[in-house]
């Protein structure tokens, strides 16, 4: 069994601070290009989603990717480009899954680790009061 | 080895909110920052970083919902 424990990220100060379960991940495209990025463990996301700029950093050609529409708060329909990527969290926790890329995530500047590929394969323990979370492989 | 996101964010202190930033794998240096993610990434690669960390300077006043 492998287990990685992360501190929550802290944005802002004092009682205005936001604490988020963020992990750093390496995204590896089928062309061999890779980039390190931060991603929120988001149980509400159906699949893994990243900013569209990340697809460009990875050298993916948008005109060759499948498209889908995704829905989030404030946006009823987002054009989303999809490709199969390997996501490496380190310490042997690595998986390949379908990843979406959409402009809607560019403002956030981080990605989402969602149900498909991530939560369906790993046990994730949130200890919000302790400001830590852990990812554990079977 | 996982990077500590809070240490990465600490390196972003003082940079313009919303800027794209490249951080070295050893978490010690800001390699590049600016408005264009591709340019920031390219400049980091030029400095010899094979897999730089790329992120955006967070806005401490922004609430997010997904």
What do the PLM-derived regions correspond to, one by one?
Chain A
Residues 1-138:
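Pepsin/retropepsin-fold aspartyl endopeptidases
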């Amino acid at each position: 069994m492998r287990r990685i424990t992360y501190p929550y990220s802290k944005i802002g100060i004092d009682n205005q601070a936001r604490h988020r379960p963020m992990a750093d991940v390496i995204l590896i495209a089928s062309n061999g290009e890779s980039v390190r990025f931060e991603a929120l463990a988001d149980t509400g996301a159906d699949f893994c989603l990243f900013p569209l700029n990340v697809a460009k950093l990875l050298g993916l050609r948008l005109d060759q990717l499948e498209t889908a529409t995704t829905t989030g708060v404030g946006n009823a329909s987002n054009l989303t480009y999809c490709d199969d990527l390997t996501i490496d969290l380190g310490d042997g926790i690595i998986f390949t899954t379908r990843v979406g890329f959409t402009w809607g995530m560019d403002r956030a500047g981080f990605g989402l680790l969602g149900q498909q590929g991530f939560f369906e394969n790993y046990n994730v323990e949130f200890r919000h009061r302790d400001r830590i979370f852990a990812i554990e492989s079977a | 080895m996982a990077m500590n996101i809070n240490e990465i964010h600490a390196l972003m202190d003082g940079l313009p909110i919303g800027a794209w930033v490249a951080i070295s794998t050893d978490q010690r240096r800001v390699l590049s920052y600016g408005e264009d993610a591709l340019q920031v990434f390219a400049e980091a690669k030029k400095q010899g970083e094979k897999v730089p960390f790329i992120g955006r300077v967070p806005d401490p006043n922004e609430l997010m919902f997904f």
